[in-house]
Structure formats: structure tokens, C-alpha cells
Amino acid sequence: MKKQPINYPIFTFRWLAIHGLAVPTVFFFGAITAMQFIQR
């Protein structure tokens, strides 16, 4: 095996960090788009 136990936690932390930032960002953009659409 290619030393998977050492590389796996880094991949998991990176995956959690990306999703932890991407999910609120998409929700934030969706809220702004909805607000501007309702204002018009």
C-alpha cells in the first residue's frame, strides 16, 4: 500500500475545510440572489 493511513487524515481535513467553506458560501450567495430578486 502507498502509506494510505498517513495521507488519509490530510485528505479528510482538506475535504472538511473545502465543504465547510463552500456550503455557507453557496447559501450566502443564494440568500443575496433571493433578496435582490424580491426587492425588484
Swiss-Prot record:
Protein name per its UniProtKB record? Cytochrome b559 subunit beta
Which of this chain's residues are annotated to bind heme? 19
- Which gene does this sequence derive from? psbF
Pfam families listed in its UniProt record: Cytochrom_B559
Name its GO BP terms in alphabetical order.
photosynthetic electron transport chain
Query: What does the UniProt keyword field contain?
Result: Chloroplast, Electron transport, Heme, Iron, Membrane, Metal-binding, Photosynthesis, Photosystem II, Plastid, Thylakoid, Transmembrane, Transmembrane helix, Transport
Q: Which GO terms describe its cellular component?
A: chloroplast thylakoid membrane; photosystem II reaction center
Q: Which stretches are transmembrane?
A: 15-31
Q: Name one GO molecular function term.
A: heme binding
Q: Where in the cell is it found?
A: Plastid, Chloroplast thylakoid membrane
